[in-house]
Amino acid sequence: MDNLKILLRLYRQYTKMDLLWFLRDTRYCLLQIVSDTICACCTIAGVFLLSEKFGGFGGMNQAEILFMMGFSTLVDGIYMMFFIGNNTAMISRIIGRGQLDHVMIQPVPIWAELLAQGFSPLSGSSMLICGIGLTTYAVSRLPISVTMPWLMLLLIYALSATALIISFMTLLSCAAFYAPAAAEEIAQVGKDLFTSLKTYPLGTMSHSVRRLFLTVLPVGMAAWFPSALLLKAGCGEFGLPMLLQACYLPTAAFALSLLTIYVFKKGMKYYAVNGSPRYSGFGHR
């Protein structure tokens, strides 16, 4: 309970800091918000135009693809709001640049600081708003029964997909403990993998490709897989096989999170002994 109070206090402080940025430098804050909105539109534009041209593809029609893109933007919005500030999601930069000590000297648990320092409820909310709006519009075009259990499933899948992306990026970032200069930007590579591929439907791809994108490279679990399950659940297709599939994403996200925590702790032990090679007599980079 004490740790939860610490986390909530940190969220409150970072909310104040984000609001102060907006009040003191409104022009640049609005520029970032508008830029994020444009990026959200550009991310989904390619797939949307393909679906308009061919009337849908990958085993989905236009409305279903629009829903998948809305879900994808919703996941990106959660990611942006909670992890975009202070390079939190790009933690390989923090590790690689020798800036992890900035987090470690804070008088709070390191996990709480890492969870809270990226929170940007004002400047980072534009993509989340776009995701909510696009998902709502897509649902209005589909024969889906929107109930409270369905909305809860949507929320669980969105949070699970976000946790999966963050865990995957952090797992890659652990390489920066051992090769700081070479792996400084590896988190961006992981993010680009999801950004470029997660909005494509995988329904008509071969089983081997789908297994690859649902296991080793889990880009399919960030948008296509949960969207397909939500569409089936909204149409009342919820038998025992569907129930087993429905548990896959939260279970995979939880398992990957545990693996990431284990590997990150191993990296922290290495860091405690060796420190950062990027320190010098003039300080660190």
List the model feature ranges, each with a label:
Residues 2-285:
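Hydrophobic transmembrane alpha-helices and immediately adjacent juxtamembrane helices
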